[in-house]
Amino acid sequence: MKHATLLQPHRTAFTVRINDNGAWCWFQDERALIDPANNTLLVGSVAAPEGLGGAERGGNIEVAVLDLATGQSQVHVLHERLESDDHNAPALLIRPDGRYVAMYARHKTDNYSRWRVSVRPHDASEWEPEQVFDWTELAGGRGATYSNLHWLEAESRVYNFVRAINDDPTMLVSGDDGTTWSYGGKLFTRPKVGYVNGYTRYWGNGVDRIDLITTDHHPRDFNNSIYHGFIRGDALHDAEGQVVSKPLLGSTGINQDTLTTVFRAGTEIDGDILTHAWTADLRGQGNQLAAIISCRANDVNGPLQREQRLDVDDHRLLYARFDGTDWALHPLAVAGPGLLPHEQDYTGLGAVDPNNLDQVYISAPVHPGTGEATDHYEIYRGRTADGGASWSWTAVTENSGMDNLRPIVVPGDPSVHAVLWFRGSMSSSQAYTAEVVGRVSRLNESDRTAQTR
């Protein structure tokens, strides 16, 4: 079924609706990728019953494939009506043989990590039957959530990072490119506080290293700091390269505060006291990393009940840059009040350009360049020439009649610059009327050279 039309064709750029009913959370990756072998962009999302297609479509786990030459897209269903919840968005991977792997899980409401492999290379139109990894015995029947797929060539191994077993970051591993999976151990563990332990974002170089940033707990329940480490050679290291957990495979997990602190709760920047941090995005190039972190500014409440309102409802986005040795932390933008009344620490989020760490996209109800409040969340592009100390901003969307949320800058082909988001209205992670849209441009050689400077 086709759901997209080319809206604004140009010679080198276009804006497009890719899926007319979909949204995602931000703790799965890759949620979108470009396959240069067939000049397509793939993006996974979850349909909601409030959107087009109604209850018959609500809860579908979908992959939309955008033809970058024509601007037309096709939506393929991985699992019909699994569960209407944006946490269930699939993670995508291109195997060395060109076939796709998609993995997805429900939001703590059953005990399975699910996956499908495409029948043919570079073709998402047909998939092998769904398979499952059953966490019931390992997790005591308390559910599993999220999928994050990272292939390391040096190990001939794919990792899938899942939230399971005490709601800790855990691992599945595959030695056959995602055809079969086995339990790989835990990254972190600690006594549980509130809802969950360790919200983690990952970035892998595809060769021998996976970097990660993680929280203590959910920011509603705990005044989080943010920590950084990396996986290499069956060991977990801190930012300085010191081994903190080995062997990693089969590990029972360590306390994440053993890693290097990127953001310490209570940090003061420009007179604002910043607390209750959350991980938003992480990308890398060479030995450098860039991360976006959300946090509360000048909070007076501390831990919250689920329906409790913040007395000072003021969130910020921070930009953190790692030069291979040290982290530097900079203010990025005002993020506004909490996005949802019962999710007091939700923001519109932001994304780092995987091909240019000096470029970010954010969603905010305040123009980051002028400070002017807007009726809806808009998308802005930010660029820095000094490692994040200062920013220039351009509006990507303006005067919108609906919110524009959770941007992604799509990896896979440095010659294609694609930023995606979903737009519409959201009352909860389970109820939304939203469509997946994006802006795509093909960069010429001078553009690519400028990005790598």
Go through each PLM region and give its residues.
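Extracellular, repeat-based ectodomains that mediate carbohydrate processing or recognition
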Residues: 4-453
